[in-house]
Amino acid sequence: CTTKTLYNEKTLIGRLHQYFLIYFETFSVPTADTLFLLILSILTLESAHSIRFLYQHFLSGITEKSLNVFYYVCSYAKVDYSRFMNTTVRITLKLIPDSLQTQPVFLCVDDTMVSKFGTKFENVSKLFDHAAHNGSNYLNGHCFVSVMLCVPVWNRDKVSYLSVPLGYRMWQKKESKLELAASMIRQVMPEFHSKDHIIILLMVGALYCYRKNENKIV
């Protein structure tokens, strides 16, 4: 199908395209189109095992773009993807009703492990997992540091907090996980210039374990 037909504003895909355009305002048209198609494939398949998986099961059926185009935009395109977090913060803060503007917002930092069955993946390593259920406290895989924004909203006349993921970054051991988390927090803090109460929560876990021999946080 043509791009014009696919992005018709009267269709669900067209409305999704309009919504995500705010994330791609500074990108070239081809790059923005490729990134949106990737997002659309993830939403459709509810999974993202790999770019090849997305291409074989969805993308190849709706676009003439090659698989390499999608690899390129994720790996080599000169795009500052960290700005996506700032855009998400701005959108999320608009969800706070006027009556709750003085309530605190929370930035929650955590880490998560993703196991890998191979050993030749980039940055894969043996990681300590305090929540492992495989008979060992270690797994072979990747570690990601995440930041989530929680904002107050009304839910049946009670204050409830809506949780919105802002971003994930792979820990590559070039810096500590806390330093990685701090860089993500610094990235989004300018968006909170109008907020007086911002609470940063660090989820206790492997992210903040001490190396006994080195006496420092890892």
Give, region by region, the residue ranges found by the protein language model:
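Conserved, well-structured functional cores that handle cations and Mg-NTP chemistry
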Residues: 1-218
